[in-house]
């Protein structure tokens, strides 16, 4: 999958650049709130009240932004190779 089609990276990068608050739910149900400081292939650094959390992506269930995030290249299912 090319970088422009990587929805995960697009969402996290837009949230970081626009300083959008996120609620990240872990697999055990614990919610973490904050802004994305940085991320890589395996982790996200989330900051809230001047405290940083290093969150491993494999522990994440759901990411909910405080407002809708427009992805750069939203495609219709047909354009994406769907039916």
UniProtKB/Swiss-Prot annotation:
One record GO biological process: regulation of DNA-templated transcription
NCBIfam families: Hfq (TIGR02383), PRK00395.1 (NF001602)
Gene of this entry: hfq
UniProt-recorded name of the protein: RNA-binding protein Hfq
Ubl conjugation among keywords: no
Domain Sm stretches: 9-69
Summary of subunit composition and partner proteins: Homohexamer.
Organism (species): Leptospira biflexa serovar Patoc (strain Patoc 1 / ATCC 23582 / Paris)
Pfam families linked: Hfq
Domain of life per record: Bacteria
UniProt entry keywords in alphabetical sequence: RNA-binding, Stress response
InterPro entries: Hfq (IPR005001), LSM_dom_sf (IPR010920), Sm (IPR047575)
Role noted for this protein: RNA chaperone that binds small regulatory RNA (sRNAs) and mRNAs to facilitate mRNA translational regulation in response to envelope stress, environmental stress and changes in metabolite concentrations. Also binds with high specificity to tRNAs.
PROSITE patterns, A to Z: SM
């Amino acid at each position: 999958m090319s970088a422009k089609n990587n929805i995960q990276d697009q969402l996290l990068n837009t949230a970081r650049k626009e300083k959008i608050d996120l609620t990240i739910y872990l697999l055990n149900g614990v919610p973490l709130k904050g802004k994305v400081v940085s991320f890589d292939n395996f982790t996200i650094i989330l900051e809230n009240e001047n405290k940083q959390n290093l969150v491993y992506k494999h522990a994440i269930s759901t990411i909910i932004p405080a407002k809708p995030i427009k992805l750069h290249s939203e495609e219709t299912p047909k354009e994406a190779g769907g039916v």
